[in-house]
Amino acid sequence: MELWLTGIVLKPRGLKGEVKVKPVTDYPEKFLSRKSYWVGGSPGDAVPLAVKHASLAGGFAWLFLEGVDSREKAEALAGRQLFIEASEAEPRKDDRAWLHELEGMKVLGAGRKEVGVLKEVLSMPAHEVYEIISGGRSVLVPAIEEFVEEISLEGRYIHVPRFDEFL
């Protein structure tokens, strides 16, 4: 079974186990109807938890999960990730990509010369950031149009013409 990231638990709210979740999806409204998630530090250690109640406010999902009935249990989930089974995902929009599809892509710099490989997409408050391995070290590049000119799922590359500015 393949699991896909859909949210990140940020922190508890209140004393009864409610958690604040940052959606990592183009479909945050699905948090209102989903009955369960796989919860863990990675897909490999995720366990299923049923949703008792869900709401959306301020760009975040607020969830009560089965078995999480105290602030202490909710605090233990902070930093954990919420996954769904790939078979349950909405169809991808033509002009979009799933985050896991980007990992492992070649990164092309000026002159379309290969400069590295995308290791991970990091979710930051303002926008995503690409962690690129180049010359044996990590380079962080904001995933915004100003720096990322093209993403080709078919060609498996990301074009960052100004990559050298981040070295």
From Swiss-Prot:
Which of UniProt's keywords are assigned here?
Chaperone, Cytoplasm, Ribosome biogenesis, rRNA processing
Compartments annotated for it: namely:
Cytoplasm
Main subcellular localisation: cytoplasm
What InterPro entries does this protein map onto?
PRC_barrel-like_sf, PRC_RimM, RimM, RimM_N, RimM_N_sf, Transl_B-barrel_sf
In what residue span(s) does the PRC barrel domain sit? 94-166
What biological-process terms (Gene Ontology) are attached? Answer: ribosomal small subunit biogenesis; rRNA processing
Q: Name one GO cellular component term.
A: ribosome
Offer an example of a GO molecular function term for this protein.
ribosome binding
Q: Which Pfam families match?
A: PRC_RimM (PF24986), RimM (PF01782)
Q: What role is this protein assigned?
A: An accessory protein needed during the final step in the assembly of 30S ribosomal subunit, possibly for assembly of the head region. Essential for efficient processing of 16S rRNA. May be needed both before and after RbfA during the maturation of 16S rRNA. It has affinity for free ribosomal 30S subunits but not for 70S ribosomes.
What's written under domain? The PRC barrel domain binds ribosomal protein uS19.
Quaternary structure note: Binds ribosomal protein uS19.
Question: What family does this chain come from, according to its entry?
Answer: Belongs to the RimM family.
UniProt protein name = Ribosome maturation factor RimM
